[in-house]
Regions:
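Glycine-rich phosphate/adenosyl-contacting loop at the front of the ribokinase-like
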Residues: 1-60, 65-69, 76-79
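Ribokinase/PfkB-type carbohydrate-kinase core domain
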Residues: 1-10, 60, 71-86, 97-154
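Short, glycine-/polar-rich solvent-exposed loops and beta-turns at beta-strand/coil boundaries
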Residues: 88-90
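Glycine-rich phosphate-binding loop of ATP-grasp-fold ATP-dependent ligases
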Residues: 93-95
Length: 154
């Protein structure tokens, strides 16, 4: 079986359903709110783990409740998350998502620990990366370092 490594973001998605999007300076009431495991990288890793079963995830989270939500989600999806960096100095990344009645959304992303998915982190995980048959990444981690990873792992 081919080994897949996903290098990317981990976010807690905070989703609020609203009747309509607020205008600048306006406050609107939310109907419901939920917290979900998310981030493009974590979502891709979970999909690979569920479909393929041989997936490792390289990312960074804080040492908070959001991190535990993400790590539990990865474990449930059969993703090897042992190399996920735990950052004491910054919280887990978050995405604050408003969804209106028509399904349109507006998203604000706070990088948080995802900022530590950088060159020094992927250099420390080189053995995992070199053992991969496929490496999957996205653009929610520091761009310059992500481009370096792609170039180095060609």
């Amino acid at each position: 079986m081919k080994k897949i490594v996903v290098f990317g973001s981990s976010n807690v998605d905070i989703v609020v359903d609203v009747e309509r999007m607020p205008q600048p300076g306006e406050t609107v009431r939310g109907k419901t709110m939920c917290k979900l495991a998310g981030g493009k990288g974590a979502n891709q890793a979970c999909a690979c783990g569920k479909l393929h079963g041989q997936c490792s995830f390289l990312s960074a989270v804080g040492c908070d409740d959001s991190a535990q939500l993400l790590l539990d989600s990865l474990e449930k999806a059969n993703v090897d998350a042992r190399a996920v960096l735990r950052c004491e100095e910054t919280p887990t990344g978050s995405a604050h998502i408003q969804v209106d009645a028509s399904g349109e959304n507006s998203i604000v992303v706070v990088a948080g620990a995802n900022a530590f998915c950088n060159r020094s982190y992927f250099e420390a995980q080189k053995s995992i990366l070199l053992d991969a048959d496929y490496i999957l990444t996205q653009l929610e981690t520091p761009l310059e370092d992500t481009y370096d990873l792609i170039e180095e792992m060609k």
